[in-house]
Amino acid sequence: MSEKFEYGTGRRKTATARTRIYAGSGGITVNGRSFENYFPRKTLQMIIRQPLVLAKLADKLDVRVNVAGGGVTGQAEAVRHGISRALLLVDPALRPVLKKAGFLTRDARKKERKKYGLRAARARYQYSKR
């Protein structure tokens, strides 16, 4: 496989996406499957396409992604982050556009841990006065 590609890593919650961008015709492959097959929800497909559409490169580049961990939404947002980072290597002039859209920022929000003595991270057990 001697095709030239640009590489980007994206993360969200516990999901990690390793993204490769090739010159091509607009195909997106996730874990060896078409991304419409891997992410059947239209909202997730839209999230993944956002950086390519914003950069007006949706039909000029092929994307191959390996994604692991997390749930479907976290994985889709990790893929978006990875594609955005790889696009910077394709064309550094895209930085202000992608940054303004918030695609280059790693969303650091994670699930807060459950604390002892509580029912969940912050929720208490029901209190009965009598």
Swiss-Prot record:
It comes from the Bacteria. Keywords: Ribonucleoprotein, Ribosomal protein. Disulfide bonds: none annotated. GO terms for molecular function: RNA binding; structural constituent of ribosome. The keyword Membrane does not apply. One of its GO terms (cellular component) is cytoplasm. It holds the Pfam family Ribosomal_S9. InterPro entries: Ribosomal_Su5_D2-typ_SF, Ribosomal_uS9, Ribosomal_uS9_bac/plastid, Ribosomal_uS9_CS, Ribsml_uS5_D2-typ_fold_subgr. GO terms for biological process: translation. SUPFAM superfamilies: Ribosomal protein S5 domain 2-like. Signal peptide: none annotated. Belongs to the universal ribosomal protein uS9 family. This is Small ribosomal subunit protein uS9. It comes from Desulfovibrio desulfuricans (strain ATCC 27774 / DSM 6949 / MB).
